[in-house]
Amino acid sequence: FLNIKKNLGDQNLTNPINLLPEIGAENGRTGIRKKEDFLKLVNIIGEDSSKNFTFAGISSYEGIAAVAMKGSNAVHDFCSKIEDIINDIPSNYYSHLNELLITAGGSTHFDIVGERFSKIKLSVPIKVLLRSGCYITHDHGPYLDALETAKSDSNRQWDQSLQPALEIWSYVQSIPENNLAFLTMGKRDAPYDSGLPKPI
């Protein structure tokens, strides 16, 4: 934030930049870890005299909480941390907004995030935005495994399946050995997030 402010200098923007500071998980990736540090940043944004910035909401990534802190209970704990911080943000920093945006990214615990954040009550409406942790489509293997894990957790009440959204066709260029085939496609054609593309 301070770097953006410094680079803008004395400019007065016609449309303020909407800012969504990130709350991070312990042992995770980016994002502010401590509540007091997060609230301090919100205060700096809210009190900025340039009027070039608007505190528009909160961002987070719950997927890393599941990895770093192990499982869906860790995601619930991370959501509780976020809810606690949100409830301590002074309302004058968002009361003028039509809605406050709360966004989280991840592809294996979006049901928990959606349910938890949709119950937050503030003086303005909440918009919950779920961001997939993948680019365009899910990888078959890891997310099917995650889905089975979700279905086995009675608290999550999963009764649906993920539907394939992208299918890529390719020629078989060569089969030089048993159980070894080369296709006319590669990682540039079918980039993957976790686990190799799966022939179907």
Annotated model-derived regions:
Residues F1, E22:
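Catalytic beta/alpha-barrel core
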Residues N7-N18, G24-R156:
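Active-site loop/helix belt of alpha/beta enzymes
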Residues I136-I200:
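Charged (often Lys/Glu-rich) extended helix/loop segments that serve as interaction or gating elements
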